[in-house]
């Protein structure tokens, strides 16, 4: 009996609740097109041009260092030399291949070392999985490459600094021991 009474009271209570009438949606307001009174003007400032890469005279930069190198004490003539790619540790872009070529030409003109041909170096780099523009150019990689090519010496070069003042550092290393036999530095012109 209680159940019936409870159900009856619930029905009466729920029937007595006012139901909300459904709301009528408001009609959309018409869109009035507005004609622009002024045409937008483009900004008057020009976009600045990126800085142009300055030409570096690599021949005059590396020649004094090569002259110091060939006069270094304790070097044997006609030994096989690997000229490793010049590394760029500056905050800008450099033509490292042009620098490496200028370095190779300056060394070959002195007739002190026998240079490993560039195509042999490129083939060895590919065999060892080294990139030509390897940004992580380490001395150990240069010595490993020189050992692979059976070179007696390796010339490791780094250009560092910023766009205003750059320096080049060269190190001649004995491949067998990794000993630095000669080190020189100069300004990049």
Curated annotation (Swiss-Prot):
Biased composition (Pro residues): 19-45
Any coiled-coil regions, as ranges: none
PROSITE patterns cross-referenced by the UniProt entry: PROKAR_LIPOPROTEIN (PS51257)
Keyword vocabulary terms for this entry: Cell outer membrane, Cell shape, Lipoprotein, Membrane, Palmitate, Peptidoglycan synthesis, Signal
Protein's GO biological process: peptidoglycan biosynthetic process; regulation of cell shape
InterPro entries hit by this protein: LpoB
Lipid-modified sites (N-palmitoyl cysteine): 17
Residue numbers with lipid attached (S-diacylglycerol cysteine): 17
Residue numbers spanned by region Disordered: 18-52
GO molecular function terms listed in the Swiss-Prot or TrEMBL record: enzyme regulator activity
Location within or outside the cell: Cell outer membrane
Domain of life: Bacteria
Segment forming the signal sequence: 1-16
Membrane-topology annotation of the record: Lipid-anchor
Record-level GO cellular component terms: periplasmic side of cell outer membrane
Family as reported in the entry's similarity comment: Belongs to the LpoB family.
NCBIfam families reported in the protein's UniProt record: lp
PANTHER family: PENICILLIN-BINDING PROTEIN ACTIVATOR LPOB (PTHR40593:SF1)
Described function: Regulator of peptidoglycan synthesis that is essential for the function of penicillin-binding protein 1B (PBP1b).
Description of how the protein assembles with itself and partners: Interacts with PBP1b.
HAMAP family associated with the record: LpoB
Protein name per its UniProtKB record: Penicillin-binding protein activator LpoB
Source species: Photorhabdus laumondii subsp. laumondii (strain DSM 15139 / CIP 105565 / TT01)
Gene name per UniProt: lpoB
């Amino acid at each position: 009996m209680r159940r019936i009474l409870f159900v009856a009271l619930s029905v009466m209570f729920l029937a007595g609740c006012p139901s909300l009438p459904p709301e009528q949606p408001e009609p959309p307001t018409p869109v009035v097109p507005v004609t622009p009174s002024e045409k937008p003007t483009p900004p008057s400032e020009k976009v600045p041009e990126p800085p142009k890469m300055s030409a570096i005279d690599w021949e005059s930069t590396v020649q004094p260092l090569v002259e110091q190198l060939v006069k270094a004490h304790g070097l044997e003539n006609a030994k096989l030399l690997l000229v490793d790619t010049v590394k760029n540790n500056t905050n800008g872009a450099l033509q490292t291949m042009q620098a490496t070529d200028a370095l190779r030409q300056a060394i070959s003109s002195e007739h002190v070392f026998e240079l490993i041909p560039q195509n042999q170096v490129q083939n060895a780099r590919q065999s060892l999985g080294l990139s030509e523009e390897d940004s992580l150019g380490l001395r150990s990689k240069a010595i490993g490459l020189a050992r692979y090519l059976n070179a007696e010496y390796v010339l490791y070069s780094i250009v560092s600094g910023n766009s205003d003042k750059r320096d080049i550092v060269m190190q001649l290393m004995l491949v067998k021991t990794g000993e630095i036999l000669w080190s020189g530095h100069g300004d990049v012109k």
